[in-house]
């Protein structure tokens, strides 16, 4: 599989407004930030992107734990983690690493929605204070329905030093620009 150089891929700054009627007209006319209008045909297998980095703080880790009711001693009890835990310090909940890691490369593609996730693995522990980043790679395209195809992408979350901590594959259902052309295999 060849990887397309990032420089040849035009980034999306925003999609044209849908002109919502419940805000000032001059605001409603602006392009939408962090939104894409890509269709199935626009996704290229092998295309890769890397996110910015982010450091996971104790506060946000504990907020997430409280929100999802995850109070396992490894993520919520400093004394247990230091004295009895196998890592000697508190972990960040895997569900938070998953959420934050995918969020780092998330965009709002108006022609796509999530079909599901496969192969989710927590490969190495992530600790409070660790800095992470994510690499997304488009793995496959599969025509599926009359108006929609499936895009499979891998998400690899790394610590700042390059150690992988999480892997998963996300399947998205994406609208065809021209269903007749895709269904005939002529993309």
Language-model regions: role of each:
Residues 56-57, 140-141, 172-174:
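A short acidic/small-residue loop/turn micro-motif
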Residues 61, 130, 144-146, 161-165, ...:
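Short acidic, gly/pro-rich beta-turn/loop elements at beta-sheet edges
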Residues 116-160:
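Hydrophobic beta-sheet segments that form the core/acyl-binding groove
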Residues 2-115, 177-187:
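Hot-dog-fold acyl-thioester-processing enzymes
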């Amino acid at each position: 599989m060849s990887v397309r150089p990032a420089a040849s891929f035009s980034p999306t700054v925003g999609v044209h407004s849908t002109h919502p009627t419940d805000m000032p007209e001059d605001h409603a006319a602006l392009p939408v930030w962090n939104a894409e209008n890509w269709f199935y045909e626009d996704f290229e297998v092998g295309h890769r992107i890397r996110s910015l980095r982010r450091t996971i703080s104790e506060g946000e880790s504990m907020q997430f734990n409280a929100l999802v009711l995850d109070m396992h001693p490894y993520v919520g009890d400093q004394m247990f983690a230091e004295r009895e835990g196998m890592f000697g310090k508190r972990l960040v909940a895997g569900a938070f690493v998953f959420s934050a890691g995918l969020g780092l490369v998330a965009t709002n593609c108006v022609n796509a929605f999530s079909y599901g996730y496969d192969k989710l693995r927590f490969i190495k522990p992530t600790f409070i204070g660790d800095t992470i980043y994510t690499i997304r790679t488009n793995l496959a395209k599969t025509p599926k329905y009359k108006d929609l195809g499936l895009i499979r992408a891998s998400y690899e979350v790394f610590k700042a030093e390059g150690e992988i901590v999480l892997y998963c594959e996300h399947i998205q259902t994406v609208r065809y620009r021209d269903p007749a052309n895709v269904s005939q295999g002529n993309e």
